[in-house]
Structure formats: structure tokens, C-alpha cells
Amino acid sequence: MEQMEMDESRGGTGLRQYYLSKIEDLQLVVNDKSQNLRRLQAQRNELNAKVRLLREELQLLQEQGSYVGEVVRAMDKKKVLVKVHPEGKFVVDVDKNIDINDVTPNCRVALRNDSYTLHKILPNKVDPLVSLMMVEKVPDSTYEMIGGLDKQIKEIKEVIELPVKHPEHFEALGIAQPKGVLLYGPPGTGKTLLARAVAHHTDCTFIRVSGSELVQKFIGEGARMVRELFVMAREHAPSIIFMDEIDSIGSRLEGGSGGDSEVQRTMLELLNQLDGFEATKNIKVIMATNRIDILDSALLRPGRIDRKIEFPPPNEEARLDILKIHSRKMNLTRGINLRKIAELMPGASGAEVKGVCTEAGMYALRERRVHVTQEDFEMAVAKVMQKDSEKNMSIKKLWKCFFLVPILCSTVCFQLKPSDVYYMGAWLIKPTRFNRRIITNSYHLQIFKPTIVLANGECHN
């Protein structure tokens, strides 16, 4: 009996193990089928989404085309005046799904082909080249960074900054706000720097465009860019349009080739935009040029350009102010006479004065010094002002580096060779030209008078 019971228990255990293994196998099959089902459902959803997109696209393709127009003004709550090119202007109805408050002048709209009903507001079309002209970051230039232009700063504040910040003053006086200003003068006198400072202090959108960017080879492209430029300025008002090198498109209208005709069309569109936009739209135009003599008189008349500001070369006091501004953060030695440096640069522009400070720092860097000396400034002035390269060294440097002991004879004849080096009785440096020279020391009785030798072998007492 006991043997039979043991056999039965063993048989039951084996049967249980068999069914458990079968159950595990079936669970694996069910899990596999479930994963396949989820994958197929995901694929079905993806295909359904594509089908919906294709149906919507097909529906749009089957619809009739719409006319594109530009809103002139709203007539009432249900009708607006729209300009459609080239048909003309039409008074159209507004679809019930469109809010009349969103329909603003100069916005692009879509009109139904059959009923001319306004059924969609379109985004304004702006050329990517035009949108890149807008400077996203406010310029960091300030009036304190401009030296010697106090009169010009005061005049541009009255024309640009005051109308933007305090338009009520003009309304109280009953006068129209100025539209634009022209900055003219030699290159490097601070025209662009002052325009950037105005944009910084007025907190306006700064749109910078060069006149050469508006010169296109295809007919009508330059005029279209001018139109889109002012459209973008209206969208981001208050804004300042700074047009540098305006003489490239604003020259006098004269007969010429086809390229000149395209430039003239671009200028005519610019004149149209200057006459078209209202001054109260907080759009100000600043133009800069160094050739005011070739600009067309139609561009310079009041109403388009209300003020012309001259930027002359800085005088001595202005050069001193510019030197102080640009040397403010430089590590200078004591006793540097900036006024003397300013006196050494007659007729220099502001950019050249700044270049002197940079070049002086480069001389100090070349000698591995952490400070700038008076001699560095003197050599920088000689280099920036384009003097003789053989004289681009101060007298003190020459005294330290290139001198000979007094020659006690009145006349000495010698032949310079590449290997000759003379210092205290020998050559100091290798000369660049090897000619036969005659050194005449007419002051041979003055024992301690040095004879200076330059790099080309010339000797001076």
C-alpha cells in the first residue's frame, strides 16, 4: 500500500510539473502575440495619421484658389477696403470666423475666388535677406563712448530720440515730427557709432542696412527689398532704420546703362516710402554717407530728410577726448602726455585715433610688456599716420638701440657687408642695402656726440 501511495504521489507531481511548463509556454506565446498586437496598432495609428494629412491636403488642392490682397482700412464691422494687385481696390465682406479687430491696415489677407469674401489673414511676406538686417541685440554703444561730437549728439537727440520718447512735446507745439536725418562727413568720424548709440538710448528696434545690399541685378528686386524693409520696420515699431553708404543708391538721376536704371528704381521706391509712411508711426530713418555732393536733391529735401548733420575731422581737443576714451582701460605708465600725442595727429579721424591706441598696445605686446609707454604711442602715431617706415621709431628708441661711438676722423670710407655688425666700434644690425657709404663727422671734436645708424646703412649725426 505504501508503495502504491508513493507511486501515485510521484505521478501527481510529474503531472503538475507538466501542466506548469505548458502554462509558462502559453504565457510566452500570449506575451509575444500582445507585443505584435501593440506594434500593429502603432503602425495602424501612424498610417491613419498619414491618411488624414493626405485627405486634408487633397481637400485643399480641390478647393478654388484665393486672391491675395492688402488691407487698406476697415469700413465698418463687416466690410473692409482691400487692394488687390493688379485689379484695384474692392470693398469686401469679412467671414464670420474672422475677428474684425485682427484686420489691421497693410496686413495680407486671402479672398475667396467666387465671392471675394475675406476668409483668412495671411502672415506678412518678408524676404530672409531683409529679416537678417534687423539687429536682435540692442547695441551696447553709449554717448559716453563718443568723444568730440557734443554738438552732433545734441542735434540727433532732437530729431530721433526726443520724438520717440516724448511725442507730446511736438503735439503741444503743433509741429510735425521729423522723419529722417542725414549724417555726412569723412570716413571714420563716428557716424555709425552715433547711430548705434541712438538705438541704445531709445530702446528701439535697430535695422541696419547697407546701400550696396539694395543693389540687385534683377529688375525690381531692389525696390521690393525696400518695401519689405519698411514693412518690417512698421511691424517692430518703434524702430530705427540705419542706411549706411546711402550714396550707392541715392546718387543723382542720370541716363546710363540698365544697371544704373535699376539703381534709380530702387531710389525712387525709397523716396516713395519716405513720403508714404507717417512720422507718428515711430519709424525713424538715419542715413550716412561720405559723398553728400553726389546725392540727389530729391532725397535731401525737407520732409524726407529733415536735418543734415556734418561730421568734420576732430580738432585737437576732440582727439584728446577720443584718446582718453580709448585709453581708459589700457595699462599706461605714469607721465604719459596724451595732449602731446593728440598734437602729433593733425587731420586724423576718430578711427585713426582709436587705431593709435590699439597699435601702441601691439608695440607693448611685441616687447612682452604689461604696460604702454609714451614711446609706444609715438611709434603708433608714426605708423597709423603712414609716415616713412624708416622713421617709425622714437628718438629715445634710436638712442638706446642704433648708435655708434664718435668717429674721430673726419672722413672714413667703408663697404657694408651682410655679415658686418658694429656696436661700440662694430655694426649693430645687418643692413638691408649694401652700398658704399661715406660717413662724415663734422663734429669730430665733440667726443660724446653719437652717430645713428639706420637699418639701411644710412648714418646720421
UniProtKB/Swiss-Prot annotation:
Sites where the protein binds ATP: 185-192
Pfam families: AAA (PF00004), AAA_lid_3 (PF17862), Prot_ATP_ID_OB_C (PF16450)
A GO CC term assigned to this protein in UniProt: nucleus
Biological process, per Gene Ontology: proteasome-mediated ubiquitin-dependent protein catabolic process
Family matches, as PANTHER family: 26S PROTEASOME REGULATORY SUBUNIT (PTHR23073)
Coiled-coil regions, chain positions: none
Molecular function GO labels: ATP binding; ATP hydrolysis activity; proteasome-activating activity
UniProt keyword Phosphoprotein present: no
CDD domains xrefs: RecA-like_PAN_like
Family: Belongs to the AAA ATPase family.
Name of the encoding gene: psmc5
Protein's job: The 26S proteasome is involved in the ATP-dependent degradation of ubiquitinated proteins. The regulatory (or ATPase) complex confers ATP dependency and substrate specificity to the 26S complex.
Keywords per UniProt: ATP-binding, Cytoplasm, Nucleotide-binding, Nucleus, Proteasome
Subcellular location: Cytoplasm; Nucleus
Protein name listed in UniProt: 26S proteasome regulatory subunit 8
